[in-house]
Amino acid sequence: MSKVCEICGKGPSFGNNVSHANNKTSRTWYPNLQKIKAVKNGTVRSIKVCTRCIRSGHVTKAL
């Protein structure tokens, strides 16, 4: 589960590339994950967090 945010659980989503000829090939959208050192359960850990959680303040960064 390496491409999943450890705070909100956001992971990859799936869909299709669609060309002008309406050909469809499968593709994947990944969340914008950053490795940060954050305080989780009272200890400092290196976790993968999406930028939405960082910006909205769901994570307290370690100093």
UniProtKB/Swiss-Prot annotation:
Pfam family name, one: Ribosomal_L28
Secretion signal span: none
InterPro entries noted in UniProt: Bacterial_rp_bL28, Ribosomal_bL28, Ribosomal_bL28/bL31-like_sf, Ribosomal_bL28_bact-type, Ribosomal_bL28_sf
KW Ribosomal protein (keyword) present: yes
Gene3D superfamilies named among the record's database cross-references: 2.20.150.30, Ribosomal protein L28/L24
GO molecular function: structural constituent of ribosome
GO annotation, biological process: translation
Keyword Lyase tagged: no
GO cellular component terms attached to this protein's record: ribonucleoprotein complex; ribosome
Entry keyword set: Ribonucleoprotein, Ribosomal protein
Protein family per UniProt: Belongs to the bacterial ribosomal protein bL28 family.
Protein known as: Large ribosomal subunit protein bL28
Source species: Geotalea daltonii (strain DSM 22248 / JCM 15807 / FRC-32)
Gene responsible for this protein: rpmB
